[in-house]
Amino acid sequence: MKAIERILSEFKPDEPILVEDIIRMFPDRSRQWVDNTLSNMTSSKQLIRYSTGVYFIPGTTGRGSSNLNPYKVIEKKYIKDENHVYGYYGDEWLLWKIGIVPRHSDVMMIVSNHEKSRGRKVKVGKVDLYVSKAPTEINKENQWVLQLLEVIRLVDVNELPDMERNQLVNFILDQKITITDVRQYCEYFPDVVSKRILTGYVYDWLHFYLKHSSL
């Protein structure tokens, strides 16, 4: 009973609860105990099972799984929680978030520590995802430089119009990305990333703004 009370007090209604959350809460308990506890709480309607490994405490509306926002599930499962960062949006979704492209693809693209394959399709609620493994371990400290290097991999920054290039410059300055950061993580990306940074017009402006963003 105390375990159930602890779970109910730890999480808010209509917020995703991952089975991994419960495992971390009770490190001395077996996986079978965790599964049985979640099953019992689901049977008694204290929890609702949203999908495999995802639960939530029902709110006052009683509408079942419709109360759980799939984007909250996606964020917690693949991108971040209150204390950790372990993923980011990729491909067109990353370019769109920074302001380099006006729209994104229908399929949400995510790069995450929680995916070990080169890429696979996943569905959360009615949202289609394509999740791929991270080039290196993502955390709070390196999330922004990894996203910058991903952008440089995706597009030739030399060819960006002024407005889109300025959006990227603002991203660099806002996130305080430094030359040291870029040099440290370049090795985890294809050679084309280093070439785009070190040659031509991209080196001139990127080096200037990266240098001054650390001042």
For each feature predicted by the language model, list its residue ranges.
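Positively charged, aromatic-accented nucleic-acid-binding surfaces
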Residues: E75-I79, D91-W93, N158
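Short beta-edge/loop segments at beta->alpha junctions of small alpha/beta modules
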Residues: K2-I79
